Each structure stands twice: as C-alpha cells, then as structure tokens.
C-alpha cells in the first residue's frame, strides 16, 4: 500500500486496511456517561445492533449489552474526567472474499464533554437547497454520508454553525449533526424518521421525559422548510455534539427559555 506515493510498511498499512476507511463500510453510535457511570446504555446498545443489522453485518455473539457496559465502565474509571460520550465504530474486516459473514471489529474513543446534557450554546442555521438527504432505512443511522460532509463545508463557508437538510420532497429531515425540535405553543414538533431524521437515543430520552411529565405534547410531523419560521423555539439534539438552542435562521431570531427549563429538569433525571 502506498500513501502519497510512499510505500508503507505492513505495520503502517494496518491503519488503512479496513472497509471503514476503504469503503465507508461502518456504523457509528455514541454511548454516554455521567459522573463516571454509563447511562442510556440499553437504548444505545439496541440502536447499535439495529444499525449493524441494517448494514447486513455479521454481529459477533460476544457483542452483548453486558460486554459493552463492562468494558466501558472499566475504561471510564481510568479517565481524568467524569462526563462525556463514547464514540463506537463497528466495521467489517477486509478479506479476499466479501460476504455477510465477513468478521466485524469495533473501535471506540472516550471523549470529554461536560455539557452534553445541557444546552451548550446558541447556534445559527440556514436551509441548504442544492443537496438533499434520503429517506430509506439507512438514512436513520450513522454511516458514511457524503451529504453531511458537503453540508459541513457549506456551513463553514457561509459562517453558519449548522444547516437544515431537506429530503427529496423538500421537507425538513434533520441538521448535519442531529435532529431538530420545533416548539409551537405547547407542542414540540419532531420530523418523522421516515422524513430522513436520525434515530437518536439522546433525543428519545428527552422527548419521552417531556411526554411522561406532560411538559408539552409531542408530535411526529412532516414539515416544509417554511414552517421552521413559525416555531417559538428550536432545539437541535445531537448524540455526538450535544444539545444546542437555535437562536437564528436567516433574519428571524428565537428565544430558548422554555426548552432550557425542560432540558434542565430532564438533566436531573439522568443518574
């Protein structure tokens, strides 16, 4: 294997000899820990299993909930910080013959994030129209997505923190990094997964709490782009980045007082 024209040793080649790097053949999920304790583990685990099945991966018998919680719990105890997330990437090994039985490996990284379960900061969005995201079963999981890469560069070039991605029907799907929640009156509107929204254990935990405690009505919706301007408040929840209040879309600004109060109450239950 060569890198920039230079021959790599066999050991150096190992870093690139996987289908995640060569083919984008991987799925990604995020486990969470707070005060050195893994939380929402079961929800994230089942999302990982579902993502791997959708990608037709050969799930090892060792990939149990107990297996992941044990290795993560041990690793967390050795960290110099208490709060954050665990980025897990499952990928197929490169073999001469590719099949659904190709062995699967996983790597994980522990990332510090002290404000993961509270609103980080205000962000500015706009709608990107020249690309769209799909609405099939692979659109809801974290796998290789060139649309995200394009949109991230677009956001940087236009001094935006994120963008609203539409589906082929010109309806709101999600943002680059996560899902959008629109508060109108006493109703939180969330784009349906069939619209291209991500499956998000973090968001599901929040809206389940809101629903059970009757803080607001939850409505799964199909929304045209213009309807974002009707919202009283907008929240973006990302399993990787955390929680952000959308304070501006084009010329309209949004407050965040009600969402802030809901997030604060929900955060206290995550123990």
Describe the role of every protein-language-model region.
Residues 1-74, 99-271:
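Helix-start/capping segments and mature chain N-termini
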Residues 66-97:
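Short, acidic/charged, Gly/Pro-enriched secondary-structure junctions
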């Amino acid at each position: 294997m060569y890198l920039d024209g230079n021959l790599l040793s066999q050991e150096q080649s190992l870093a690139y000899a996987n289908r995640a790097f060569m083919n984008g053949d991987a799925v990604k999920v995020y486990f969470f820990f707070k005060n050195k304790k893994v939380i929402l583990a079961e929800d994230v685990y089942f999302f990982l299993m579902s993502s791997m099945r959708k990608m037709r991966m050969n799930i090892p018998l060792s990939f149990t909930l107990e297996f992941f919680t044990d290795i993560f719990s041990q690793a967390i105890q050795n960290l110099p910080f208490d709060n954050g997330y665990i980025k897990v990437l499952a990928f197929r090994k490169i073999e001469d013959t590719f099949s659904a039985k190709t062995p699967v490996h996983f790597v994980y990284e522990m990332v510090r994030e002290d404000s993961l379960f509270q609103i980080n900061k205000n962000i500015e969005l706009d709608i990107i129209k020249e690309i769209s995201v799909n609405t099939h079963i692979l659109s809801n999981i974290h796998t290789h997505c060139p649309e995200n890469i394009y949109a991230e560069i677009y956001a940087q070039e236009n001094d935006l923190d994120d963008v609203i991605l539409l589906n082929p029907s010109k309806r709101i799907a999600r943002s680059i990094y996560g899902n959008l929640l629109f508060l109108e009156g006493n109703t939180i509107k969330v784009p349906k997964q069939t619209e291209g929204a991500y499956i998000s254990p973090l968001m599901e935990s929040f809206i389940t709490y809101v629903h059970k405690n009757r803080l607001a009505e939850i409505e799964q919706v199909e929304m045209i782009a213009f309807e974002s301007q009707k919202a009283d408040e907008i929240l973006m929840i990302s399993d990787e980045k955390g929680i952000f209040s959308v304070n501006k879309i084009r010329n309209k600004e949004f407050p965040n007082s009600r969402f802030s109060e809901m997030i604060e109450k929900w955060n206290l239950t995550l123990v």
